[in-house]
Regions:
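Serine/threonine-rich, repeat-prone extracellular segments and beta-strand-based repeat modules
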Residues: 1-2, 18-63, 153
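Contiguous segments within soluble domain cores/interaction surfaces
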Residues: 1-5, 24-27, 64-177
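A short beta-strand segment in extracellular, disulfide-stabilized domains
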Residues: 3-15, 45, 86-88
Length: 177
C-alpha cells in the first residue's frame, strides 16, 4: 500500500476467536482512525490480540508514505524533437500543499518511451542541471529540469526521478512530435 503524504488513511481491524473469546485487541490507533501518513517512508501497522486463555497473535500490514508530484507544465503538449522541455514540478501532499524545499534533491534517473520501445539517457540542455539534478527555483517554489529532446523519436516519453527521503520512484511525461 502506498499513500500520498498527509492523506487521511483509515484502517479498520478486528480480532476474532472461535474458542474462549477475545480478551484484548489493540492497534497503534483506535479502530477506524487514521494511520500516520505525515512521515515519508516505509511503515508497519500491527494489531495485537489475546484470547481469554492467554494465547496471543498479531497481524502486520506494511504501507509506504510518499510525495505526490504536482506537475507545473502541460504533460500532453507536444514538443519538437531537438527542443528543450522545461520539466517543472512541486512535491505535494495529498491535499496539493507544496512541500518543495531547496534542501530536498530531485534527481532524474531515466527516460523511457511510454510504449516501451525505446529508452535513452537523461540529457539536460546546457549546464543548468548538473549531475541530472533538478534545480530548485525559489520563485516557482519548485523544481526545474531543462530536458533536451535531441534524438528522441515521436511519442510519449516518461522521465523517472527520485526524491531525497522518498522511497518511491516517481515519473512525469511529455510528448515529442
Amino acid at each position: 500500500m502506498c499513500f500520498d503524504q498527509r492523506r487521511v488513511a483509515c484502517r479498520e481491524w478486528a480480532s476474532a476467536d472461535g474458542g474462549s473469546g477475545v480478551a484484548t485487541c489493540a492497534g497503534p490507533v483506535a479502530n477506524g482512525n487514521p494511520v500516520d501518513t505525515t512521515m515519508l517512508g516505509a511503515h508497519t501497522f500491527t494489531v495485537d490480540a489475546a484470547d481469554n486463555l492467554g494465547h496471543t497473535a498479531n497481524q502486520s500490514v506494511s504501507y509506504t508514505v510518499a510525495y505526490n508530484i504536482c506537475a507545473l507544465y502541460d504533460q500532453t503538449r507536444a514538443h519538437r524533437s531537438g527542443s528543450t522541455v522545461p520539466i517543472k514540478l512541486q512535491l505535494c501532499d495529498s491535499a496539493g500543499a507544496n512541500h518543495s524545499a531547496a534542501a530536498i534533491v530531485v534527481n532524474a534517473t531515466g527516460l523511457t518511451q511510454q510504449d516501451g520501445t525505446a529508452s535513452d539517457g537523461v540529457e539536460d540542455s546546457g549546464d543548468a542541471n548538473p549531475d541530472d539534478n533538478f534545480r530548485y527555483d525559489e520563485e516557482l517554489e519548485g523544481y526545474i529540469f531543462n530536458l533536451s529532446t535531441d534524438g528522441l523519436t515521436t511519442g510519449t516519453w516518461v522521465l523517472s526521478f527520485t526524491v531525497t527521503g522518498d522511497p518511491i520512484p516517481h515519473t512525469v511525461q511529455f510528448d515529442v512530435r
